[in-house]
Amino acid sequence: SANYVKTRGVDIPNSLAPALLFHPLPKGFKLPSGPSRFRPSASTPVVRPADLEDLAFAPVTELAALVRARRVTSVELTRMYLERLRRYGPMLQCIITLTDSLALAQAARADAELAHGIYRGPLHGIPYGAKDLLAQKDHRTTWGAMPFKDQWIREDATVIRKLEAAGAVLVAKLTLGALAWGDVWYGGTTKNPWDTTKGSSGSSAGPASATAAGLVGFAIGSETWGSIVSPSDRCGTTGLRPTFGRVSRAGAMALSWSMDKLGPICRTVEDCAVVFQAIHGYDPSDPTTVRDVPFVYDANLPLRSVRVGYYRSAFDSVKQNKHLSDSVLTVLHSLGADLVPVEFPADLPVDHLTHILSAEAAAAFDDLTRSNRDDLMVRQIKNAWPNVFRASRFIPAVEYLQANRVRTLLIEETAELFRTVDVIVAPSFGGNQLLLTNLTGHPCVVLPMGFTDRGTPTSVSFIGGLYDEGRLLAVAKRYQDASGHHRRHPALR
């Protein structure tokens, strides 16, 4: 058709969304209002260790206490993490670019500000890594893919800019599975630090691997369908996938304009809360972001005040490590939770809505496909982006729109479920909740629930109501503090 030929001639940047903007709001839903409140756990005195590398696995909250008290400088922390990145990064294949000059300059500025009484908050002087789909104007942004390995985007992503304003120090741009699928990128396969014969999963492969290995204080990942949950499960990290529209994606690679979300990958739930506090909020550069929605977090929220549901059929059908998933419910009971059995909507064909993602991804990278530069992609198997992009050009527009209409029904039914409970605990890969909640835009916290017989971590997920990250994080924190699985770390050689 002449129409197609003419539109193909228009130069459309990857980030430009269609005129049809997605918002996950069910009918009659009122956005939360009021002031934000952030009440973290009471701080405990932290002593500088004799060997600074003993802080490699410390949570952000402990690092922040040391930096604020000026017992440790940001430059010292930054040099320590840069050294670990150089030492272990090649083995784990988790680094695309070390941003050492930028990092040392940011760290020196953080220390100078502290010396003059300027403290930007709990991320002041804390080193972190960013998934390399986030633009940073002084370095390449490769999207993990060979066709883009020399790409330079001369702007900072909003999240990068917000973290700089919070005083954080960018030490590395970390790997992602090429164009945000899996753990294979143009330079290799990112490894799981608990078992380096295995991949880290993805697509936030580097953020999870590097955080688990103590190479950064925290990291920023992204999720479209499992890309924070899956590598966090594999690597034993704690991740927050925020509500769709809570965190700006401006300056981030677009894969699915209606499903992409950015969030932190950390060592603790409270670290996720600290990072989320810094990066969330409205951004005119991303029209899907919401205005004036508060973030209310209270680390000491009584569990009895929260209606906690558990995804009964998914827990009942667990085959592997069932003793670990059952222990999650036991711990929650012991903390005073009155667990209510619930089920996610089962009458709609959730598993058959994946072509929403495939169609949007194919459109986002249509120029790559039509230019034949997709031949440069490392993975050319059936279930990898080059071939999925090619096949998805044959998805009829009518079917894409009809799938999104079914998605609207799914949003309404899930809203009904969250009228009965505030938080739902579920096996991370149980039933269809992972795809379902990515389609509906609900927030999720994934965290370790124990270790398999092979000594590798596995996880559980807590899902919250729309824009209710504060309560979700508080509940997940109560479980994490009681279970303590996050305190174990891999032994690197």
Specify the residue positions occupied by each region the protein language model found.
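Serine-dependent amide/ester hydrolase catalytic core
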Residues: 1, 60-66, 105, 112, ...
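Short, well-ordered beta-strand elements
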Residues: 264, 456-468, 472-476, 480, ...
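Short, well-ordered beta-strand elements within core beta-sheets of diverse protein domains
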Residues: 62-69, 148-151, 260-267, 390-395, ...
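Short glycine/serine-rich loop segments
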Residues: 155-279, 427, 438, 442-461
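Gly/Ser-rich, acidic/histidine-flanked active-site/gating loops
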Residues: 43, 48, 53-61, 89, ...
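A short helix-breaking turn/cap at a secondary-structure junction
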Residues: 44-46, 238-326, 371, 375, ...
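Short helix-loop capping/hinge segments that flank enzyme active sites or metal/cofactor-binding pockets
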Residues: 32-52, 57, 123-146, 302-311, ...
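Gly/Ser-rich catalytic/binding loops embedded in alpha/beta enzyme cores
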Residues: 1-225, 243, 330
